[in-house]
Amino acid sequence: MQNGTTIGIPPENERVTERAEPVPSDLLPNNSPVNSPTIDPTLSEIKDVAADHNEEPPSKRRKVAGSTPSRRSHSRAASPPWKKAGADGPTSKIVDGKRRSTRVSNVGPVEQPPSDAKPTRSSQKQYVSKAVSSQRNAAVSSPLPMSPSRSGINRRSLAGVAVNGSPSTTAKGSIGRRRRESPSPVSKRASTRTRPDNMDAYHPSNGVTPRSNSTKTRSTRSFQLASSDFREETADDIGNDGQDEHGQRIQRLRIKVKKPALSIQHPSHVLPTRKYGSFKEWLENEGTGPGRMLTMTDALEEAQKRRQVTEAMEPGGLLSSEVCSAFLPEPQEELPQQFSHQDHLVAHALYFKKLLDKEHRAHRQAAKSLAAACAEVWRKRNKDPEDILREQQEEMRGKRKQLAKDLKKMFELARAEIDRVRLARWEEEQKAKDQRALDRAIKQSTMLFEKRRLEILGETGSDAPETTTDDEEVETDNGSENDDEEGESNMSTETEEEDGDDRDDDVGLTAEELRLKYANLPDTNPHPDQSPYSDEDSEDSDDIAADNTPGDTSGGVNRSPPPDSSGQVELDEVDPVLIDDSDESTDMDDDMGDSDDDGYSEAESDDEDGGEPGLLGFFSAKDLSLSNLHQTNSGEGDTHQTGADGDRNEDSSFDESEFGSEDPDEVTLVPTGPTNKDLSTPATVTASAELEPAAMTPSIDQTSTEEPIAIGTETPIETVAEDAAALADTEPVDVDVLDTSTNDSVPPVMSPATNLLKQIERQQHEPYHSRAASSEASPGTVATKPSEPESVSSIEAPAEKHAQPSESPGPGLKTPIPHLLRGTLREYQHFGLDWLAGLYSNHINGILADEMGLGKTIQTIALLAHLAVEHGVWGPHLVVVPTSVILNWEMEFKKWCPGFKIMTYYGNQEERRQKRRGWMDDNSWNVLITSYQLVLQDQQVLKRRSWHYMILDEAHNIKNFRSQRWQALLTFRTRARLLLTGTPLQNNLTELWSLLFFLMPTDGDEAGIEGFADLRNFSEWFRRPVEQILEHGRETMDDEAKQVVTKLHTVLRPYILRRLKADVEKQMPGKYEHVVYCRLSKRQRYLYDGFMSRAQTKETLASGNYLSIINCLMQLRKVCNHPDLFETRPISTSFAMPRSVATEFETSEALVRRRLLYQHPLEKLDLDFLNLVPISREDISRRLADDSARIMAYAPFNTLRERQYHRTNWEMKFNGSTVQSTLEALENDCRKRRMAELERSLYFESKRHGRRPVYGSSLIEFLTADSKQRPTAHGPLRKRSYADWLSSQSSVLASMMMSLEERSQAMDGYIQRFACVTPAAVAAGVTEAALTPISTRHLTNKERFPPHDPFHEAQMRLSIAFPDKRLLQYDCGKLQRLDKLLRDLKAGGHRALIFTQMTKMLDVLEQFLNIHGHRYLRLDGTTKVEQRQILTDRFNNDNRILAFILSSRSGGLGINLTGADTVIFYDLDWNPAMDKQCQDRCHRIGQTRDVHIYRFVSEYTIESNILRKANQKRMLDDVVIQEGEFTTDYFTKLDVRDMIGNDEALKDEASAAMDRVLENRVTNTSRVFEQAEDKEDIDAAKNAQKELEHADDGDFDDRANANASGVTAASASASGAGQTPTQAGTPLPDEAQQSLNANNAEVAEDTADSDPSVGHIDDYLLRFMEWNMKDEPLVLPVDKSMKKSKKGKEHRLRKRRR
C-alpha cells in the first residue's frame, strides 16, 4: 500500500501479516559486475545534496526528469513500520506551542546539478550491489532476510517512536499531492498495515537493501539528534525511505548508536526555524536590519526624512493636529437603523428565493430518481445474458454470506446451550456430591451415636436370658485366645457357628436384626420420617431382605469366605468405631497399659484402637488401608492384623513427622488412640472372654453397630421411595458383608413374626444375669458411651472379680465418681461426667454445651480427676478461660479437687517469666489456667509443651475461624480437646462450624487426617433452613427445611451435650423475661432525627461499606442509650467578644472628657465650701450647728501656728557641706511642712464649723404636716403613742415591702432553678463605659470581705449555665424508666444486675445512682483480676448494695452473682448469646428466688430492629440446638416396642398429621412457586423430584424379582448399579429429562432405536457440538462477589498494548 491505495497488488492479495513465500528464480542475487559510470553521478549528487542540507531541514523529494521506470511484475516491499502513508517529509512542526504546516517551506529547493545518467532504480540497485560486494568483509549483514521475530521487534520499537514523535496524516489531499509530486518508483512504499502475499518477491535481486541515500540519512540524523525527538523521528522517516524491512538499514538507524536527545517538554524546546536558508541569502539580506552600519549617504537620507517629518508636524503642516486625521476624535457609533418596511420586504424576498431554490432542487432530485427508475426498468426489460448471470452470482454470493452468518450464529447458540447444559450438569453433580457427603456424615454420626447408645442399652437395657453354657464360655475364651495368638479378626469361630445352629433362629438375633428380618411384611407403613434413624432402618431392612434370599449363596451373614480366601474379600472404608461395640474407657496413653473389653474379644479392641474414628463420616484415602481390619469371618485374621499394624505404623510416623517426638504422650490434632496391640494382657483376654456372653445378648436397635456399612462402594442403599427425605439421605454403600460380632450366626430358618413381640416382652421383664460386678453398667443412661468401670491400673483376674462387690456408681452410669473429687455431684452432672469419659475413651473431642449455671466447671474438674484416678493421667492440662474467671477456676479447683497442682498463668511479662521457671517438670503442676489474651501473647512458649487435655471455657471466644485466637489454639499439640460454652450457636452456623472444625480439624488433603467438613459444604448443606428462619421465622419452614434440620441434629448429636436448667433442675427458680419499651426524650428524638437526616449519614448507609454502616448504627445506639454519649450537653456560656464597641471609643472619650472638664483651679470656686450657698446647709439642725461652733478649735490651732512660725528659720537654705548643717537643714524643712499642716487645719476648722443653716432641719420637720400613714416605720419613741403605731402596722404589707437583701434571699430558689438562659454574646468594658468608674474602695479591718451582693447569683447563672444534674435523667427515656424500676425493686427487697456494652454508659449510670443515693458496685474491663473476685463476693454477701453495674463483655462471663434476682439489660447486644450469658450470672445453681429479666428497648429506633434480629438468632438457636435434644436421656423417650414393633403406629400417626396439614397445601404451594420462579429453576426442581421418586425404582424392581425368581443378590445389585451412577448417586440430567423412571427410560431407548424417522437438525447440531466440546474444560462462572470493586475508576481509560 502507498497512501492507502494498492500499487500493483490485487485486493485479494492484501494481508496484514507477512506471508513467507519462495523467492522467484529471476529475483535471486546477481553477482555480475555493474558499470561504475552509471553510479558515480548519482553518488556525487547525493553528496552535494547532503553537503547543502547538513544544517537545515531536508527538502521534499522531487521527480527526477525523464525517469520512467518499467513496471515490475511484483509489488514493492512493505514500508518500514515507522514510515507513514503521508508525505515524505514532516507534514507539521511545533512553533510556539502551536502546530504549523511544513508543506510551504521558507527555504527554497536546492538546485541539483545535472547528472549524466538518470538515477533510475536499476542504477541504484547496481550501485548497492557493487558497494555490498566490495565491503563483504565489513559490518554488513548476509543477503538472507531478517528473521520475522527480529524484524517484528524492530518494527515495534521504531513504530512507537514514530507515533509518539511525529503526528502523521493520511488525508486524501496529501495522498493525491504525493502522487503528483513523487511519481518515481523510489518513493512508492507499501503501508505498514498491509503485507502482500509474495512478500519475498520485493527483495532486490542482489539480496541486500538499497543504499542510495545513506549519506543523506546520516547527515540528517546528526542534525535531528541535536534538535529534538520530533525531528529525530522525521529524519528516521526520510532516511529509511524505500527501505525493505528485511534489510540492514533498520539496524543501522537505531538510536542507541547515537547520543540520546532530550524529549520535548515545552514548546520553547523546539529550535526556531532559521531565518536564512543559505549563506547566499544571508549575504543578500545582511545589513538591512535595524542594527546595520549606515553609510554617509544613508545617514543623510535618514536625516532628511526626519527633518521632513519634523517640519510636517509644525502647525499648519501635514502631520499637525489641525490637518492630520489621526488627531481627529473618534467618530460616534451610529445608532442601528430601525427595521423598516423595506427590510421586511427584503427579508421576505430572500426567504421566498430560498423556497424556490429548495423546490428547484426537489424537482431535480425527483427527475433524477425518475430517470434512474426508468433506466432500471429498461435495463431489466433488456437484460443481457451476462447481466443475468452476474446478478445470479451476486444473489448467490449474498445468500452464501447470509448462510455463513446464520450458521455461525447457530453454532454460537449451540455452543452456549451446550455450555449451559454442562454447567447445569456440573451444578447437579456438585449438589449430588454435597448430598453424598452429607449422607456420609449423617451415616457416620448415626453409627457413632448408635454405638454409644448400644454400649449402654446393649448391656443394661437388654434383659435376654443368658443362653450360653459354660462350655460355650470356655469355647469363647479359647476362641478369643486363638484370635489373640493367631491375629484373627473379631468374628466368632466356626465352632461357635456350629453351636449356634442348634439354637432357635430368633433367640440369637438382636432386636434390630429381628426388625430387619420382618421388615418386608405387607403391612409396613411407608413413612419412615418419624424416627431420626428410620432412614437407616429401612435401608438396612431392605438390604437384609435382599441378601437373605434362599438362593443367595454370597449374601447374608453366612457368605463370609473360608479362611484360606481371606485375602480376596475386603471391606472398603469401614470405620473401626462402627464395628467395635466396646464400651470401656480406653486408655489414651500408649504407655498406660491395657484396656478392658466388655463383652468382646481382644481382637475387637485392637481393631478399634488401630483405626481412627470417622468423624462425621468424611472418609479419606487413609481409611482404605483400614478396610482389611473389619471382615466378617474369623479366618481372615492374619490379613486383618497385618493391615492394622500397617495403619498403626502410618499413624505413628505421621505423628512423629508432624509434631516431633518431644513428648511420648504427644499426638496429632485428631487423636488416633493406642497404637500398640501388645499392651493387652492375659487378664484382659480372660475378662473379655468372660464378659462376652453379655455382649451377645440382644440389644435394642443396633443398626449401626450390628451392620457396618462401607461407604463409597458400588451397591446403593435401598430406601423407601415414598419418602423424599429418606431418599435424600441415601448413599451408595456396600452391604455384601454384615458384622456378626454380637450374634455369631443367623440361621436360615426364621421364626414367625407373631412371636416377636412376646419374645421382646419376655426379654424385657427377665432379670439381669449375674456377671462381673465391676463390668456391669446399670440402665438409665442413654446416648452416652459408658466408660470402663475398672481403671487400667486395677485390672484383676476374672476369678477375683466374681468375689468383689459391685462398684457400679449408679443406675445407668458406668463412670464412678473419682475419690479425688471433694463434694457430691448432682445426677445430671454425673451423667455429664459419664458422657465426657465416653468421649475420652472413644478418642472423640466434644462440646459440653450445658446451659449456663449447670456446673460445667465442676464436670470438667471431675473429668480431669477421673483421668487421674482411672487412667493415671495427671496432666499436663491446659485450661483457657476469660480473664475475669481465672481466679474463679483456681478456687473451684482448690475447692473440688485439691489434689491437683494448679498454676494460674497471668500477670505482667516478668511475673509470667518467673512462673515459667522449671515448668517443664511434670511434677511441678498438673493444670495450667490462663486467659485467651495471654495464650496469644505467649503462644510460642505454650506450644512447646505437649498438652494432654486442652479445655476452652466460654468457647464462643473462638467462634470466628479467621481470628488469631482460633488459628493459634488450633496448632497446639494436644491429646484431647473439650469446649465449654453455654451458647454453641450464637449468630450463624459458621460459628458452630468453627467450633466443630476446631475439635476435628483436617489437613485439607483427601489422603490426610479425617476431620470435619469444610465450610463450603457445611454451609451448603444447611443453608435452606437458616435462610427461612432468618427471613420468615421458624413457623414457615417447609418440609425439606425441617428434614435438613433433622439431619443437622443427627450430625451434631455425637459431639454435643446440651442440657437446660428446666430439664435437669426441677427445683430451679423460674425465669421471666420482660421487654420494656422506653420513649425517647425530646432531646433524644431531636438528635436521632437530626443524625438520620444528615446527607453524610444517608450516603454512608447507601454506600454499603460495612465499617461505615456499623459506625452509623453505633452512633444511633449512643443516642438511644443517653444523648450525652452522642453529644455532651455543653456548659452554656455567652460568646465572649474580645472587646466591646464602646471600648474602642474609650480613649477618645477620655480625651474629650479631659478637655471638656479641664479648667484652672482659680477659675471656678467652691461656693459651698466658702459658705456662700446658705440654702445648702438646711439638712442640719440648728442645735447641731450650735454644738459644732461651741467645740470649734480655731484658737488652739492658731496658737500652735504662731509657735511653729517662730521656730522655723525661713531664710535658711540647704547646706550639705557638713553633717551638722545637713541635719539642721532637714529639721528646718520638717518644721516648714508642720507649719503648712497647721495652716491647712486652721483653714478647714474655720470653714467646717462656720456652716450654719438658715432654718434648720428641726424647724422644717416641725413645720411639715405628714397626712400619710407610715405603717412600716419604726416604732415611736414615746410609749403613749405605741398603741397607735401597732394598730397601724400590717404584716402583709411588711412581707410585701422587703428589702433588697431579703428579696434576693427569697428569690434564690427561683434563680437557681430557672436562671439558665444566657445572653448570646457578652463584651468586656460595657459596664465601665456606661457607669461612672469607682475610683477606690477602702476596706477596714472589720470589712475584710465585701458585703453580700444580691445580684451575684443571678449574674453568674445568666452569664454561665452549668447543666442541671437532674437533666442527666430527664434527657434520657431509659433512665426515667430505670428510676421507677429501681424504686420498685428497692421497695420489694430485690437486687439488680445492670448490664451495658458501653463503658461510658457505666459512667453515666454511676452519676445516676449517685444522684439518687443508691449503693452500687462496678465491674468493667479495667477491673483487675484479683479485684473482680472481691467485688463478686462483696455483692453476694452484702444485701445493702442495690445494684451491680457491669459491662456485658467482661462482667458477663463466668462469675457467680446469685445475690441478685433481677437482670436489667440497659442496651441490647447484637449477639443474643451474650445477653444469655449475662442473665445466667444470677439464674444458676444457688439461686433461690425467681429471676426477672428486663430488656430496655427504645421505641421506633434501631434498637427495635436489633431486638428483632436477636429474636431471629434465638429462633435459629432453638431450631438447631435446643430442638436437637443433645442430652444423655434422648433415647429413653423411645420405647422398645416403638423401636421394634410399633413403627407402623408411629408412621401412621405422623403420616395422618402430615396429610391433614400438608395434603393440599403442598401442591398449591409448588404451583405458586412455579409461577414465581424462572423456567430453569422449575426444570431443575422437576428433575430433582424425578430423581427422588424414581432413582432407585430399578433397584427395588430387581430385588423384588430376585426374591420372586430366586436370582442371587449379586445379580440384583449389579442391575441396580446399572441404573444408578456410582459416583453421583443420582441420575444424569439427560436421563432425568428423558424418562421418569428406569423402566420408562428403557422403553424410550427401545423406541428410539426402532424409530426410523430422521431427527431434527438442532438435535444433531447439539450432539455434534457436545461431541466437539467434550475435551474442552468447563469454564465456571465468575464469582461476582470476589471481583474487585472498580468504583471510582470508571473514568480511567484502558491503554491499548501495542
From Swiss-Prot:
Residues 1-249, 456-682, 763-818, 1586-1632, 1673-1698 are annotated as: Disordered. SMART domains: DEXDc, HELICc. It is found in: Nucleus. Residues 12-21, 45-59, 1586-1600 have a biased composition (Basic and acidic residues). Its EC number is 3.6.4.12. Residues 1683-1698 have a biased composition (Basic residues). Coiled coil: none annotated. Residues 329-403 form the HSA domain. One of its GO terms (cellular component) is Swr1 complex. Component of the SWR1 chromatin-remodeling complex. PANTHER family: HELICASE SRCAP, HELICASE SRCAP-RELATED. This is Helicase swr1. It comes from Emericella nidulans (strain FGSC A4 / ATCC 38163 / CBS 112.46 / NRRL 194 / M139).
